Amino acid sequence: MPSTQTYIELFERLRSVHLHVDARRCLAVRNRNTTCNRCANACPSGCITVTTRTSANEPREPDGAKPAENGRSAETATLAIDPERCIGCGTCAAACPTGAIAPRKPDDRSLARQAAAALRATGGIVAFACEQLTAQARGKYDPDTVVPVRCVGRIDASLLVLMASAGALTIRLTCGNCDECEYRAGKAAAELACQDANAIFDAWGTRARASVTRKLPAACRAIAGPAYDPDRRAFLRTAGDAAHDAAHDAADLAIDRAFEHASDTQRTRRAVMETGTLPRFLPPRRAILLDALERLGEPDHVVLNT
């Protein structure tokens, strides 16, 4: 089992223009007995890998599934990180349950602001689109209505719920042909994020819905024809609609509030605690999710499977 210091050094190698890393939050650093390897499972490029070795000398049960009576595990997991293979998709960050890995350029707050702008442009729809799809559809969609990401696997459930709390009823994670994409593993991550978000929407009784699709919503289409005026959509959308603007101003404030609250939770207990343990913390995305749920109101007393 690698030492805590070894894990910290390995994760620090991930720090780049694409990713922010706080190794102290990694479950493998905080608990040597953890089996968490979500980042490695999500990574589509082989930048983060976990290999498992079974000791031939370690006693095993006949079915090979459990350690023998001594209770010791016969399997040793080894983490390996090759920063040169990082493609900056952000899927590992979306998979990380503790915020040990966080995306940059854009970070979550910038991405949420882009999504809020798209929400205003469409009047209730947020469409994220991967780089393959945006390249294929260039010129066919209004860029003000689409939030570009390298891979839709970078989107996590907290962002989807946050956008629903800001007024989005339709949230699309739009991708190209994932089978031919180097980020293909991101589609499964995106589908899981939508599944989790939709379970929350059902529990809270909201009409919002998130889905992975290969087509952008009709509201995102570019206005074609010789009479095209780049300001026409904005004019039609805002003319005489002060209430509409006020609602979206409130949504912007809600998004800013959620991220400010998440930032505040990170300023406490940064040092080692008196007991000698690492500081406890609320993962930023968890804080954002809690803020979004508060804005959505009370749940409909539905039990969620977690």
Describe the function of each predicted region:
Residues 1-18, 24, 28, 56-74, ...:
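Flanking helices and flexible, charged tails adjoining ferredoxin-like Fe-S electron-transfer domains
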Residues 1-49, 55, 59-73, 123-136, ...:
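Ferredoxin-type iron-sulfur electron-transfer modules and their immediate structural context
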Residues 20, 37-54, 75-103:
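Cys/His-rich short segments
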Residues 29, 82, 149-150, 183-187, ...:
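Hydrophobic alpha-helical scaffolding
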